[in-house]
Amino acid sequence: MTGRLKLVLASGSPRRLSLLNQAGIDPDALRPADVDETPERGELPRACANRLARAKADATLKAVQLDDDLRGSFILAADTVVAVGRRILPKADLADEASQCLRLLSGRNHRVYTAVCLVTPKGNCRQRLIETRVRFKRLTEEDIRGYVGSGEWRGKAGGYAVQGIAGSFVVKLVGSYTNVVGLPLYESVSLLGGEGFPIRSGWLNAG
């Protein structure tokens, strides 16, 4: 590969893109992977996040290999799983799903896992799994109805977005906040930098 090193984000998530931009990294392309995100029967949360992040990276790699402009790019993929014990909560698409998630999370501890998978221009794969523990306040039915009415939960793991209204539900958070948003920033940037991606090239005049 010659010329400037490029980065493809294997996601269409505005949150993941915004987090990378916050760190001064602007991907050259967004290539969301079309992957079935249904957990396998009996699959544990950690294993599910790791499997899906790798599947997204592999699917995007195949697509990028057909693109002359992007072939040989770094590919960054991630998958976030919210779990209560061993139970994996859905990425809520329906109001009923979101309501069920919120009732389950109400007044309880849960864990958020994000697996990050980086494929280098040489085809090497590096993967990290980050865990954050979160506790919600006890939610009233008014809280739940109001939040579901906001629509903020759509497509979000566990049926909530911590960077929005649901941030006011959090009593305690132990670990990476950006992990709960959808991309553990420290670990993702460390992976990129460790594999030779110029993580500081976008810092000039960033302010």
Curated annotation (Swiss-Prot):
Annotated site, Important for substrate specificity, chain positions: R15, T80, Q163
Cofactor or coenzyme needed: a divalent metal cation
Cell location: Cytoplasm
Broad class of the protein's primary localization: cytoplasm
Reactions the enzyme catalyzes: dTTP + H2O = dTMP + diphosphate + H(+); UTP + H2O = UMP + diphosphate + H(+)
Active site residues per record: D79 (proton acceptor)
EC number(s) from the headed UniProt entry: 3.6.1.9
Source organism superkingdom: Bacteria
Gene Ontology CC annotation, any one: cytoplasm
Keyword Hydrolase: yes
InterPro entries: ITPase-like_fam (IPR029001), Maf-like (IPR003697)
Keywords for the protein's UniProt record, in alphabetical order: Cytoplasm, Hydrolase, Nucleotide metabolism
Gene Ontology BP term (one): nucleotide metabolic process
One Gene Ontology term of the molecular function aspect: UTP diphosphatase activity
NCBIfam families given in the database record: maf, PRK01441.1
PANTHER family: BIFUNCTIONAL DTTP/UTP PYROPHOSPHATASE/METHYLTRANSFERASE PROTEIN-RELATED, BIFUNCTIONAL DTTP_UTP PYROPHOSPHATASE_METHYLTRANSFERASE PROTEIN-RELATED
Family of this protein: Belongs to the Maf family. YhdE subfamily.
Function as written in the Swiss-Prot or TrEMBL entry: Nucleoside triphosphate pyrophosphatase that hydrolyzes dTTP and UTP. May have a dual role in cell division arrest and in preventing the incorporation of modified nucleotides into cellular nucleic acids.
Protein name: dTTP/UTP pyrophosphatase
Source species of the chain: Nitrobacter hamburgensis (strain DSM 10229 / NCIMB 13809 / X14)
